[in-house]
């Protein structure tokens, strides 16, 4: 499936939901791309999981902001790769730093930068510990085993909609 066709499929999925997140946050390594940045060089040509680009462009087309929350000992390489992929300006926040603290620190910064409440965010990551920590903040979180794809994208939007409809969520908004 080509990028444009994947984007259209992602747009169709977005159209199934009355309530969308205000911000979708992605981890990088093994979520958007199938490698660790620290195992690469800035000279390398990065590549994404097959569905990632279409999903990101569909979100942007629907007016949903996107952000990055990533821990990496080589944030310079991660940022260079985003630039090579043409994504440098796509993200309203890029929290990429080498600290090995919890992802909750990334989300505190994203919240301060964007003003988006945690309950209005959807997060995709490949590590259980990140999902567990960030979900306690009220963010809808989806664990991805083999990168972000249309299936876990649909699941994320479904879970977000269910969380949004809960009485606890309505109080938070």
Where are these regions (language model features)?
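Metal-dependent phosphoesterase signature
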Residues: 23, 29-50
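Non-catalytic pre-domain segments flanking phosphatase-related domains
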Residues: 1-28, 39, 169-173
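A general structural motif
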Residues: 19-21, 63, 118-120
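Conserved H-loop
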Residues: 87-92, 117
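Substrate-recognition element of Asp-dependent hydrolases with the DxDx(T/V) motif
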Residues: 52-82, 94-100
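Catalytic phosphate/metal-binding cores of nucleic-acid and nucleotide-processing enzymes, i.e., regions
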Residues: 15, 42-48, 79, 83-87, ...
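Acidic, Mg2+-coordinating phosphoryl-transfer loop and its flanking beta/alpha structural elements
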Residues: 118-164
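Short loop-to-alpha-helix "cap/lid" segments that border enzyme active sites
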Residues: 100-113
């Amino acid at each position: 499936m080509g990028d444009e066709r994947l984007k259209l499929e992602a747009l169709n999925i977005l159209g199934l939901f009355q309530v969308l997140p205000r911000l979708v946050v992605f981890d990088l390594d093994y979520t958007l791309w199938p490698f660790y940045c620290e195992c690469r060089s800035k000279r390398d040509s990065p590549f994404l999981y097959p569905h990632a680009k279409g999903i990101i462009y569909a979100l942007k087309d629907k007016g949903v902001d996107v952000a990055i929350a990533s821990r990496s000992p080589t944030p310079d390489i991660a940022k260079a790769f985003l630039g090579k992929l043409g994504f440098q300006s796509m993200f309203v926040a890029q929290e990429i730093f080498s600290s090995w603290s919890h992802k909750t620190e990334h989300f505190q910064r994203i919240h301060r930068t964007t003003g988006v409440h945690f309950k209005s965010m959807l997060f995709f990551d490949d590590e259980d510990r990140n999902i567990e920590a960030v979900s306690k903040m009220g963010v809808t979180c989806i664990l991805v085993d083999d990168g972000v794809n249309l299936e876990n994208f649909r699941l994320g939007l479904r879970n977000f909609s269910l969380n949004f409809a809960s009485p606890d969520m309505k109080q938070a908004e």
